[in-house]
Curated annotation (Swiss-Prot):
GO terms for biological process: cytoplasmic translation; translation. PROSITE patterns: RIBOSOMAL_L34E (PS01145). This is Large ribosomal subunit protein eL34. The modification N6-acetyllysine is found at K36, K43. The gene is RPL34. Belongs to the eukaryotic ribosomal protein eL34 family. It comes from the Eukaryota. It is found in: Cytoplasm, Cytosol; Cytoplasm; Endoplasmic reticulum. Its main location: cytoplasm. The keyword Lipid metabolism does not apply. GO terms for cellular component: cytoplasm; cytosol; cytosolic large ribosomal subunit; cytosolic ribosome; endoplasmic reticulum; extracellular exosome; nucleolus; synapse.
């Protein structure tokens, strides 16, 4: 005959926090084991990239709190909050803006020297 199963905790509804799986004990009984919720890795701070960040553990917030810093970020500028592609683009953009400022300054200086002559 099939063995009947009962929940081991007080919550008797099939909610997200009450998910279970079957497990066979050494005494050949089948019992419920409660499964933990799956974690998600953080998304990029840029808000453009659709995927999750690589190099960061995908765990629940309570577990994340206990992890060491090396498991929560990657050793790069904006590591753990922004993906590598976005960081690369941001650095390039900042460089080009600085170059543009220098070009404007040089052109202004040339115009001043032309006026002086």
């Amino acid at each position: 005959m099939v063995q009947r199963l009962t929940y081991r905790r007080r919550l008797s509804y099939n909610t997200a926090s009450n998910k279970t799986r079957l497990s066979r004990t050494p005494g050949n009984r089948i019992v419920y084991l409660y499964t933990k919720k799956v974690g998600k890795a953080p998304k990029s701070a840029c808000g453009v990239c659709p995927g999750r960040l690589r190099g960061v553990r995908a765990v629940r917030p309570k577990v994340l709190m206990r992890l060491s810093k090396t498991k929560k970020h990657v050793s790069r500028a904006y590591g753990g909050s922004m993906c590598a592609k976005c960081v690369r683009d941001r650095i390039k953009r900042a460089f080009l803006i600085e170059e543009q400022k220098i070009v404007v300054k040089v052109l202004k200086a040339q115009a001043q020297s032309q006026k002086a002559k």
